[in-house]
């Protein structure tokens, strides 16, 4: 933890550096006002295409911007992007990404086009992923990502890592609040045929405690390390080989006070997480028109947690999870002419999960074979169309076809119109069907899969352990989720240099799977299960503006408006069938149609304002970013977390989220960074995240408060750049 003197020193140095930065700003016309070259995107079509040629909402985050922001982990980067909301897991441990109002399990996270596995409670822990070796992050929103399978209903986030490029090496270190230390280094080597890139990262922290009156930390101390490499080799004039690998390991030390009856008991223990992947890829060009790619991807994720009683050392809690994923795939691209490009491919997935969270602990398997196609067609010079689809067949959910259609029309040099429409599908996963899990370390909450919930609740009720409960007969089998989505947008150059984009989206989901509280124990511990919301939708708009206001200074503004509702509830409200009880007068009233807020954990309004300064000649970089999230409801996580009682959001007990319920208030985070590079290859950086120290210990435990840091890096390349 920084001392007060250290904190004051960093604030003073940042403000002083900003003063030097502003003193060098020239209020003159800048060449950045001219049209910039489009970046290349791979994710949207599985092939390299420029952003300007893609008829669907896409965005790109470069490594230069990541470096200027001072981000260390993937969640730090994504939380500042328009339309992306980082949300905590139900137990307050970990972070997932919400895209277009859809839950984290509907956004596919890829590394170089391959999926990252290991979703606890449906959420992929984003902080597992270091950003030091990232070349760029590509984000594709909406159904145009259907080439990647049914899990990508909301979209795809693809992390493109560095490849071997010349002979160079670098080292980076950073120290900050909560005794957080980050060390990383990379080296690249290439000759005529061989290229090697190696990256390593070590990250450790003491965690943080937002509720010192309770025993234990909000986030316990942990340390992890990442090692990755990529080797490329030219097998012939037309054939290239690439082999990439990654290894991650984390250890965490727990100290919890848990409730057992009316007693508070001290426990402690350790947890570890480990994952690895291997990805060989062969690319062969038969001629100037035909290219084929064969790849094999293997990955495994393991996690284990052991807690013991501090009094006698006896075992209190054990949790283990192991997930494996294997996938061979072949795809080809045929270039007919400038107006027609065809991509076809297919593959096979073998996936297994074994965990103590299932009653029998038996390893369960799922096998899926699939094929996909995509035709890129340009009928006219200003009009392009992409038609594609994917067919999946699984031993669990049978078969499903997911089509997509996207189109773009260049109205003129300043306005480009885009639209995409598609269908998606997601079957209930292992967790939603078989889970039987209790986490005493986070207040004793339990999660039951649909196949075991009714039987387990009947047992608890017979033992007199339930305070309230749904009728077990109301907890039925889950049905597969089906989606239909549409995105309509435009890219517009409003003024020379002033560029904007807007995207209207609508996601219609039938049988949306959501968590619900099905019972509360006599110890005030919640029991969750899963249910299908028969008809739900998320819709709204996203917009961004970018403008180089003065030389070397770029301004960006982003905003999202979101409506997310259960259509059956909406119709009941409109028909006058839903009531609420006024908490002041105790009078029961009919709920108005405009008083139904919608689904939990969705903010109606969110946005960001960012300023970036870059003067390569003088070696200065700086940024000031404001991230806003509007109010949202939290009804699905009432209970005890870290010893604190969370009040239910639905305080008028009508079973929905309306304007008279409790909300988490909207908030804004302010982040600052400044960096100075010198000619010898060194770069120094100072920064403050969450300048005004906003925290919400109960409802938003993934916000650690004010974070101050200082870092230094060194880079060297053989050509002197």
Question: Predicted regions span which residues?
Answer:
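Extracytoplasmic beta-strand/coil segments of soluble accessory domains associated
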Residues: 75-118, 135
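Conserved C-terminal beta-signal and adjacent last beta-strands/turns
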Residues: 188, 199, 232-234, 593-721
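Short acidic/polar hinge/loop motifs at secondary-structure boundaries
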Residues: 114-141, 229
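Periplasmic-side early beta-strands and strand-to-turn transitions of outer-membrane beta-barrels
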Residues: 167, 174, 189-273
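N-terminal periplasmic accessory domains that precede
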Residues: 39, 74-77, 95-98, 125-130, ...
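Gram-negative outer-membrane beta-barrel transporters
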Residues: 378, 504-509, 526-638
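Short, acidic, small-residue-rich periplasmic hinge/interaction motif at the N-terminus
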Residues: 24-67, 104
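Outer membrane beta-barrel strand-and-loop segments of large Gram-negative receptors
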Residues: 228, 317-331, 364, 370-372, ...
């Amino acid at each position: 933890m920084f001392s007060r003197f250290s904190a004051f020193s960093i604030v003073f140095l940042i403000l002083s550096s900003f003063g030097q930065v502003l003193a060098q700003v020239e209020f003159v016309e800048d060449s950045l006002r001219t049209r910039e070259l489009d970046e290349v995107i791979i994710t949207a079509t599985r092939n390299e295409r420029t952003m300007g040629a893609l008829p669907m909402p896409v965005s790109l985050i470069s490594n230069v911007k990541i470096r200027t922001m001072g981000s260390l982990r993937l969640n730090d980067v994504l939380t500042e992007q328009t339309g992306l909301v980082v949300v905590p897991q139900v137990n307050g441990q970990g972070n997932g990404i919400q895209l277009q109002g859809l839950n984290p399990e509907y956004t596919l996270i890829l590394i170089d086009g391959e999926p990252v596995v290991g979703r606890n409670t449906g959420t992929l822990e984003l902080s597992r992923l270091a950003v030091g070796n990232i070349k760029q992050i590509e984000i594709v929103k909406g159904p145009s990502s259907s080439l990647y399978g049914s899990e990508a209903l909301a979209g795809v986030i693809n992390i493109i890592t560095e490849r071997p490029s010349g002979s160079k090496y670098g080292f980076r270190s950073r120290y900050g609040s909560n005794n957080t230390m980050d060390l990383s280094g990379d080296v690249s080597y290439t000759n005529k045929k061989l290229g090697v890139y190696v990256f390593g990262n070590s990250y450790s922290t003491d965690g943080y405690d937002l509720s010192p009156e309770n025993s234990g930390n909000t986030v316990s101390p942990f340390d992890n390390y990442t090692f990755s490499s990529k080797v490329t080799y030219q097998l012939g004039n037309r054939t290239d080989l690439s082999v990439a690998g990654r290894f991650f390991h984390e250890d965490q030390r727990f100290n919890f006070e848990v409730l057992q009856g009316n007693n508070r008991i001290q426990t402690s223990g350790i947890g570890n997480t480990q994952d690895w992947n291997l990805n060989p890829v062969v690319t062969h060009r038969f001629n100037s028109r035909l290219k084929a790619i064969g790849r094999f991807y293997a990955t495994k994720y393991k996690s284990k947690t052991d807690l013991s009683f501090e009094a006698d050392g006896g075992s209190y809690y054990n949790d283990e999870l192991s997930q494996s994923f294997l996938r061979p795939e072949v795809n080809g691209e045929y270039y007919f002419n400038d107006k027609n490009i065809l991509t076809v491919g297919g593959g096979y997935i073998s996936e297994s999960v074994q965990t103590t969270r299932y009653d029998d602990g038996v390893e369960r398997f799922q096998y899926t074979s699939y094929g996909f196609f995509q035709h890129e067609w340009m009928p006219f010079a200003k009009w392009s169309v992409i038609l594609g689809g994917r067919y999946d067949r699984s031993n669990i959910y049978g078969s499903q076809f997911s089509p997509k259609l996207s189109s773009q029309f260049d109205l003129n040099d300043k306005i480009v119109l885009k639209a995409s429409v598609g269908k998606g599908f997601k079957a209930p996963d292992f967790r939603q069907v078989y889970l039987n899990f209790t986490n005493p370390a986070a207040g004793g909450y339990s999660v039951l899969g649909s196949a075991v919930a009714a039987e387990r609740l009947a047992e608890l009720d017979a033992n007199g352990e339930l305070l309230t409960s749904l009728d077990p007969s109301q907890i039925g089998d889950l049905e597969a989720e089906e989606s239909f989505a549409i995105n309509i947008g435009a890219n517009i150059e409003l003024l020379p240099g002033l560029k904007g984009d807007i995207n209207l989206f609508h996601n219609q989901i039938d049988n949306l799977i959501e968590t619900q509280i099905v019972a509360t124990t006599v110890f005030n511990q919640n029991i969750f299960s899963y249910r299908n919301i028969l008809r739900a939708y998320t819709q709204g708009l996203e917009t961004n503006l970018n403008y180089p206001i003065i030389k070397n200074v770029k301004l960006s503004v982003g905003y999202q408006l979101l409506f997310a509702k259960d259509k059956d509830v909406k119709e009941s409200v409109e028909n006058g069938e839903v009531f609420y009880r006024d908490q002041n007068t105790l009078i029961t009233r009919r709920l108005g149609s405009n008083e139904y807020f919608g689904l939990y954990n969705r903010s109606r309004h969110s946005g960001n304002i960012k300023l970036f300064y870059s003067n390569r000649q003088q070696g200065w970089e700086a940024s000031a970013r404001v991230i806003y999230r509007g109010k949202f409801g939290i009804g699905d996580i009432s209970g005890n977390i870290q010893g604190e009682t969370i009040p239910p959001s639905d305080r008028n007990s009508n079973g929905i989220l309306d304007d008279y319920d409790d909300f988490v208030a909207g908030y804004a985070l302010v982040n600052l960074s400044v960096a100075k590079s010198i000619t010898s290859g060194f770069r120094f950086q100072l920064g403050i995240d969450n300048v005004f120290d906003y925290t919400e210990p109960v409802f938003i435990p993934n916000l650690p408060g004010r974070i101050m840091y200082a870092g230094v890096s060194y880079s060297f390349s053989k050509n002197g750049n």
